[in-house]
């Protein structure tokens, strides 16, 4: 697996990203955070001004202040730190890890450390299968969203299916057979199950 996944903080951050994909949450000290549905699939390099030091990063989400006056794209660096990008010329240090960012600091420390530089080497990796699917349900019902939360255990993947206000959980094994499901329709692949 490598060094990055042997660190307990990195495992916590990876689990947070996997479980919060596609969700919006309030941050401590004001503001909100939206975790992208495809968080972690696009990488880029940030090179600091006046040096050859570069940091490889991937996109996690978008954070906004209370009055919606400032908006940051949240990036996680290869060093584990969380950064925010307000414009394309600098990064703002937000916190040392994602857990601390969500639970303690939020975007309150956004202007304490700002690093000037340039972005380059943008690369969009292919997203995993069944990442984020939109589909129309039967007539007369609202449009539903099926999101892969990727709670990968040895043999099961958990999917969350959202209908307006209520969520329905389904557990599906690797052969796409439903082990348990709620009362609503669940869609995966080309098949819709009632």
Curated annotation (Swiss-Prot):
Pfam family for this entry, one: DUF1314
What name does this protein carry?
Answer: Uncharacterized gene 71 protein
């Amino acid at each position: 697996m490598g060094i990055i996944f042997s660190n307990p903080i990195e495992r916590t951050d990876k689990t947070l990203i996997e479980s919060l994909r596609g969700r919006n949450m309030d941050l401590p000290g004001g503001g909100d955070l939206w975790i992208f549905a495809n968080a972690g699939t696009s990488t880029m390099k940030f090179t600091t001004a006046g040096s050859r030091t570069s940091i490889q990063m991937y996109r996690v989400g978008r954070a906004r202040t209370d009055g919606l006056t400032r908006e940051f794209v949240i990036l996680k660096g290869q060093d584990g730190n969380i950064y925010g990008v307000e414009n394309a010329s600098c990064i703002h240090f937000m916190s040392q890890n994602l857990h601390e960012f969500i639970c303690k600091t939020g975007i309150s420390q956004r202007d304490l450390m700002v690093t000037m530089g340039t972005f380059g080497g943008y690369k969009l990796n292919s997203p995993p299968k069944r990442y984020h699917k939109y589909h129309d349900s039967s007539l007369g019902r609202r449009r539903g969203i099926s999101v892969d939360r990727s709670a990968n255990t040895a043999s099961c993947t958990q999917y969350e299916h959202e209908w307006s206000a209520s969520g329905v959980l389904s557990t599906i094994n690797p052969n796409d057979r439903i082990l348990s499901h709620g009362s609503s329709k669940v869609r995966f692949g080309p098949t819709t199950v009632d």
